[in-house]
């Protein structure tokens, strides 16, 4: 999923959505599998501007596996508490895996990045959720500005759904990678941009296998931000596009592999 913001509206002008934009049998990665880039392309957030529902609430701040998580009170009390407890347990599962995989110094930085989880946001339909890099995109649409600089899980129950786990078991890692890119490395980090440009010139992401066995354009080809987040999934865990895992990444895109090894640390 892409960070939602102005830069992605610009990116969509050049490339509308991801590989499935070219696939005659669309199966979006992160929009219910939906991608947040798709949410900007189709812009469900702005399609009904006059009908935006206010979804502001005071979250309950929880520490989950060392991360600060802003929790919708509906997930903790009342009729949705059981489902909420299961969703928060699954979020903890995602975060536990990240905590195991990252070296201590990188983990310390990663845990500074915050998460916001809604029972069900009425307008932002990207699932399980995007990363919001800035306030402007949010305030222009009447959304809570406190979502800025946070990974936003827009519908808690999406974390429990089988199709999401099959497609992208590292979705929280993907979104936290966006946050890390933005807040720790900087979206203008030159090494990532250079690696992305080299890969695009070589065309190595133009046609790859996805988790369904279909040949598609890799979501990493969208822009350098998705290139980094998608590569992070493969390097640290498993992605839903080839290269799926680290050994394949090392063979397919050694420049990105070595860069990620420097950023995240060696895996031995």
Protein language model regions, located:
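Metalloprotease/metallohydrolase-associated module, dominated by Zn2+-dependent proteases
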Residues: 140-148, 162, 196-268
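Acidic/His-rich structured neighborhood in mature extracellular/periplasmic domains
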Residues: 85-197, 201
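Short acidic, Pro/Gly- and aromatic-enriched capping/linker segments at domain boundaries
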Residues: 47-61
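Extracellular/periplasmic catalytic domains that process cell-envelope and extracellular macromolecules
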Residues: 62-63, 107-109, 220-224
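Acidic/histidine-rich, surface-exposed loop or edge segments in extracytoplasmic proteins
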Residues: 62-85
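Stable alpha-helical elements in mature extracytoplasmic
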Residues: 4-7, 11, 87-94, 168, ...
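Short, solvent-exposed loop/turn segments at secondary-structure junctions
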Residues: 76-77, 120-123, 234-236
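Compositionally biased, proline/threonine/alanine/serine-rich low-complexity intrinsically disordered stretches
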Residues: 2-49
